[in-house]
Every structure is written in C-alpha cells, then in structure tokens.
C-alpha cells in the first residue's frame, strides 16, 4: 500500500522554482532517506509532505488523501525539524500541557514513563538536553 504519493509536485519561492515536478511513491513499511546538496529543496519537500507548506502544483497524498489543510491526515504525520528552537525554553514537564492541547490522544502517564525509561529528568529544559534526547522527547508525540 502506498502511504505517501507525490505527483508532479512543484514549489517556488518567488520566481525561483525549488521543487521541479517531483514524483515519488513510498510503500508502507519501507525506509527512505532524503539526501542532496544544500539548498536543493529537501526541507521544502518535507514541509510540503507534512502539510506545513502548500505545493504550487501537483498532488501530495498521505494514505490516499490530500495533506494540506487536512487535520485528519496531519494527525497521522509527525515531523521534528533538525533544529527546533521553538521549544528550547520549555521544561519537559511543561511540554505535557502543550501536548495535551495539540494531541487529543496524548497520554500523560505514558509520556512520563517514556522519559523516565530513557533517563530524562522532566524538570530539565529542552535546551539542556543533548540533541538526541531533545529529539526523543519531541518525537514521542509523533503518530
């Protein structure tokens, strides 16, 4: 089953076309990497796939449904940027309130148990963690 389908996806910033008719099928259970030189559109493509950006042309489907402005589909997609400055000042335990508001199925006890199992002190700020620890904490809520 195709979980991600891109059909002739194009995206420009002003007059500069960044994505040039991308076509891609990702099958359920497969693993893929996205590599390329700086500025070639990797982050733009990921942000289009996750529905953060809208493509200018083409179609992006997650499990057969359009992703942009589709909360039902976005609830199935998780994304944590390589650098996530938005949450740096938060303590891990403060993230609980944020997660409760953003994710209806968020389980506070499971989140605390998870952080304890990987040795994270929930009183620490995100910026006090290693990059891997911070990503683990932020990825926890990915569907």
Segments predicted by a language model, with ranges:
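The feature captures the beta-strand-to-loop junction immediately N-terminal to the Walker
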Residues: 35-37
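Conserved ABC transporter NBD signature motif
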Residues: 58-73
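Conserved small/polar residues in nucleotide/adenosyl-binding loops
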Residues: 140-143
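Short coil-to-beta microelement around the adenine-binding A-loop and adjacent beta1/P-loop entry
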Residues: 16-17, 71
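Helix-to-loop junction immediately C-terminal to a conserved catalytic motif
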Residues: 50
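ABC-family P-loop ATPase nucleotide-binding domains
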Residues: 81-137
